[in-house]
Amino acid sequence: KDGMAYRLVPAVLSSPQQNWIVEQAFRQNGLGGTQIRANNLDSMYKTMMNDFEFGGAGKKGVYYDEENRRHILAIRSLYGEAAGNMADAGRKDEAQKLIDKVEAGINPANLPYGLVSRYNSHNQTSMVYLEACYKAEKKEIAEKVRTALRKDLNQQFDYYAALGGMSRAEFDNLFNTY
């Protein structure tokens, strides 16, 4: 991947997704894994830091409909993927710069880290971003993302529990048995 586009060229592939805990967790829970793949880190970093602009996504008070949220979420995910792979390659300074740029470029008040969405894809994407923040040692941002995700997931659980079915204890026990 070069920046935000795939390029078809002969290459020796590595498997950076093996370094991601979220990739393994999604696969174990039948979610099919993530989109994390081998990247041309130098080209991706150059494109994201020098060429890409967020087009006003950092402005306060902007509303995004579901389709626009999906697109902006993909951008946040790509920055997270690049930052996590950079950190795995020992390039934490560059990873931190990527996280800083996306944080400045996408206002979390307009596009929260945790949010109900189709197939819960918003929260899945945020989990990739959360892991990238930890890998890049951006612990303050990681804590904000973790708190928002946990709050949203708990609210979703409470909603579904109110409909009947499993109690919180039964649900927690389900995950503790694995």
Where are these regions (language model features)?
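ER/secretory pathway lumenal C-terminal domains and tails of membrane proteins involved
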Residues: 1-178
